[in-house]
Amino acid sequence: PYELIHVAIQLDEDEREAYDLAYERYRTFARENRIVFRTPADWSKFMQVCARSREGREAFTAWRFARGLAKASRAKLRTLWTILCRHRHQQAILFTDDNATAYTIGETFFLPVITHHTKISERKALLTAFREGKVNCMVTSRVLNEGVDVPEVAVGIVVSGSGSVREHVQRLGRILRPGPDKRAVLYELVSEDTGETFTSVRRRQHAAYQRE
């Protein structure tokens, strides 16, 4: 059995204001250029239009800023610390959608990080230490989505992620390992009233996210 816990996080007032300003700048540019995001092709069009002018580049920068803020806001990091303390006697894997967020978490909480930049030898050493219980918590940016056996993990924390159903079912698979009296937990941290809200809705529509 496993438990899914959706955690909605309110941004701090100053970060909320900064997010809204940046997001509105990006959306205004998209509207002025008649770009409606319905398919991946629309995003490609947005990127092409952004590259043609200073205003476009500023709009893209604003989008990146807002997205990064939602992924690793102060409020989200505080919430993450609370969860880590709650499960301090259990092994946990933290999932992020990008390397920058993974490294921010690693530096903030002094946790080992595995990304595609991590050397193979270092990755193997960390995973071995994790399996042997010498490392209690690990942060990864997509690298562990598939093909890695970590049988003792009972806690997963999705700090940020894409809307890919396949990706998140794989994340469930990383923690849902059979064991006596074991109940796995998957936390999903979502910055409320940001682009993360819509991403969360998409991925949780999958049957794997409906089970309790």
What residue ranges belong to the model's regions?
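Conserved segment of the helicase C-terminal RecA-like domain
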Residues: 174-207
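Interdomain helical connector at the RecA1-RecA2 junction of SF1/SF2 helicase-like NTPases
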Residues: 1-87
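Conserved SF2 helicase motif VI
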Residues: 127, 155, 163-185
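Amphipathic alpha-helical transducer elements in NTP-driven molecular machines
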Residues: 13-16, 20, 77, 124, ...
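Conserved helicase ATPase core of P-loop NTP-dependent helicases/translocases
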Residues: 91-96, 100-148, 166-169
